[in-house]
Amino acid sequence: MGQDTDMLNTYQQLVRTPSVRPGQDVRLQAPGTRTGLLKLLSTVSQDKQGCLGSGDGVPNQDLQQRSQSSRQTAKKDRKPRGQSKKGQGSEESEDHFPLLPRKPSFPFQWAWESIATDVRAVLQPSSPTPGHQALPMPSSFSQRQSRRKSTANLPEAHGCCWKTEAQNLKARQQLGAWGGVSIPTGKGELGSEPPSGLQLPGRRPGSGSASDKQVQLQSLGAEEAERGLSSGVLPQRPRRGSISEEEQFSEATEEAEEGEHRTPCRRRAGCQRKGQISGEEASDEGEVQGQSQGSSPSFNNLRRRQWRKTRAKELQGPWDLEKLHRQLQRDLDCGPQKLPWKTLRAAFQASKRNGKAYASGYDETFVSANLPNRTFHKRQEATRSLLQAWERQRQEERQQAELRRARTQHVQRQVAHCLAAYAPRGSRGPGAAQRKLEELRRQERQRFAEYQAELQGIQHRVQARPFLFQQAMQANARLTVTRRFSQVLSALGLDEEQLLSEAGKVDREGTPRKPRSHRSMGVRMEHSPQRPPRTEPTGSQPDRHYNPSLDPECSP
């Protein structure tokens, strides 16, 4: 009876202890699952608790049947999550205990029954003295401690897998509440060491060594269950019978170490894949960086070399015109219908060996592109037209290059001819200056002779028209004499018109006739617009005019 009171006090302490700790994350604890469960367990009557305090650690038949039904219900709930295997302990218990209909009970009673059955399975192989047997810490409490440590020590550098874990947080909490088994929420939870054990008050330090080992074994079993759930396999309970406690502890430790090595490797591989993707995105700028933690430099060098080879092949590309030209010539030689299937298969295998099949769906594309169907003929015709256009372009470029070369040679020949014409043969001799001076004098004499010939031509042209020149000179002389005669008459005070009329009368009466030329010239002068009354402006007329004025008959 005292042991029952001690167990009740222990569970009341466990109820109060996690609720007052300040560092506990309230979000990771579903309301009403564990704290309410332990409160309800603390109020269970003494006859229900008497079966646990009997000293042998084995519950009664009713508790075994209800725990068996609760395990079956929990396994049915876990089956939709991808777990199809069953534990060995459940198969043995199904053989021994028949299935009975479940009695109505308080909420989450089956969770506590599974915890009690796990405790019984752990305590059965080695049971020390009944009076000093320590009650192991429940897996829910160790789970809360490990989860609190993991959430407190979770590094920010491992944020690559945080989105996926945050999305499945509700599912993990629900699964942990059903089976009392936690699922790791990050890398820090697997890496954190489980608590060594909970020493109950009032016990001696030496008497709790077996309970410490059992608590460590239970925490390692919880971690193994977490790893099994994460890998998709049901956790198996420790085998009963001839296996001792030390063998169980060593096996659990080895499995825990292997699981801790496997899980970071898996996560490291996922981070490496993310790093490879980000490195391929940054490879266009020439920066290949490994985003994963723990990736070796040799792996980065290998990735860089592979990327360079792929990049070189992509730069070489399928549009190598020489290769297309050769392939087109082969197709034209053998014909599209004569292309055998073995040649297609050999070409396909060669392309796969060369690494040209980048995607998984490239195989069908390659086969359908090389089969002699309508698409193949259209593609071949397009390739042929492309090659013909390329050949025409190359021929035009060749012709233009030849034309440019011929034009350049012609210009060079002209320049050489001009230089040879302007540079005398012996221009580099000792008498070059004298010869140059003689050449200049010869050119000057030649130019002077040309000028003299031009002047002689002008003179010959003037002499060929003498009448025109004479008429011009006579007209100029006549105008000058008439102007002078008018000035003299005006100075003497004589009337020019009266004098001209009298002179005309005298001329008609007795003067001999003058030459025809003079008369004609006088007539022309009378009809001139300047002085119409003037007649016969010859040199003998003034003497004839002055003579009558000197005559005594005409004098006043």
Swiss-Prot record:
Residues 1-16, 208-219, 289-301 have a biased composition (Polar residues). Keywords: Coiled coil. InterPro entries: FAM161 (IPR051655). One of its GO terms (cellular component) is cytoskeleton. Residues 1-31, 50-102, 123-155, 179-309, 503-556 are annotated as: Disordered. Residues 244-258 have a biased composition (Acidic residues). One of its GO terms (biological process) is cilium organization. Residues 379-464 form a coiled coil. It comes from the Eukaryota. This is Testis-specific protein 10-interacting protein. It comes from Homo sapiens. The gene is TSGA10IP.
